[in-house]
């Protein structure tokens, strides 16, 4: 069973609110989950402490058990100082399209 820590959307139309949950990766985004770890309210100001609330002890336990955080949750954990997020690197992104196609044709 592949376990992931991710955001599950709640709230109403045009007023998003997210629960930070632990779920099996095969379950739907807003479907069944194993445990709720906190919440994220994107409508609040970025400097407001109530914008993101996480139970850090539970998060650490799930990470120790092998749960993989989603990209957005990994950002939250990096900000909280729990888990360092690796920078993504795409070296082909900087190469112009014409040069990229020429390099692929030359291979």
Curated annotation (Swiss-Prot):
This is Small ribosomal subunit protein bS16. The gene is rpsP. One of its GO terms (molecular function) is structural constituent of ribosome. Residues 85-107 are annotated as: Disordered. One of its GO terms (cellular component) is cytoplasm. It comes from the Bacteria. It holds the Pfam family Ribosomal_S16. Coiled coil: none annotated. It comes from Rhodopseudomonas palustris (strain BisB5). Belongs to the bacterial ribosomal protein bS16 family. GO terms for biological process: translation. Transmembrane segments: none annotated. InterPro entries: Ribosomal_bS16, Ribosomal_bS16_dom_sf. Keywords: Ribonucleoprotein, Ribosomal protein.
């Amino acid at each position: 069973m592949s376990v992931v820590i991710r955001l599950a959307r709640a709230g109403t139309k045009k007023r998003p609110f997210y629960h930070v949950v632990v779920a099996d990766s095969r379950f739907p985004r807003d479907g069944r989950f194993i445990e709720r770890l906190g919440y994220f309210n994107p409508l609040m100001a970025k400097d407001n402490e109530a914008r993101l609330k996480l139970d850090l002890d539970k998060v650490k336990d799930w990470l120790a058990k092998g749960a993989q955080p989603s990209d957005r949750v990994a950002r939250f954990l990096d900000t909280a100082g729990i888990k360092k997020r690796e920078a993504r690197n795409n070296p082909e992104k900087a190469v112009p399209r014409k040069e990229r196609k020429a390099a692929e044709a030359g291979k």
